[in-house]
Amino acid sequence: MARYLHKASKQWHYPAVDTGDCGPEYIRNPDLSSVDGVPQHRWIVEGDSVRAPTTEETAAFDAADLEAAKLDKMAAIDARTAEIIAINGVIVNGVAISTSIAAQVSLNALEGLVRLGVATWPQEVSAANGGSYTINSQPDFVRVAGIMATFVTTTKAAGRALRAQVLACTTVEQVQAVEDSR
């Protein structure tokens, strides 16, 4: 049975009925002796023949693979950073206060009221368990906001440090070895 290699996608096509020609975008039963051991996505198709990449082409493939690995790893780090902030909380007086984006926005709004001099006390903020924590005074607010800001900024800083490690990598293997154990 004949098999056809698509010139652009480098994917195999096995027609149910072999007419001997699948069109100009396919190569029928190509000679693959020159690409033995070369990953299929790196094959170079020229006309109706397949060859291994040159040193320069291999370097370009390696650079593209490294860039893709870095982007994937940094996206995973960013997602983990957002997850840590959204799911976790900071403990204040035995209550886990939510550090979600919504909770941060609420504290920012309360800070705006404090700056305008129109804040009233007590104020409630969301707790991680679905309940609430009562802020009884401006000094208590400053303490809670400071604890939350420290948690969020240190979590983001840890993510940035991991991203810097990824950016410094020179091989895909080094990128894969960067571990986000937060």
Where in the sequence are the language-model features?
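A preference for well-ordered globular domain cores
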Residues: A2-R3, K7-P39, E46-R182
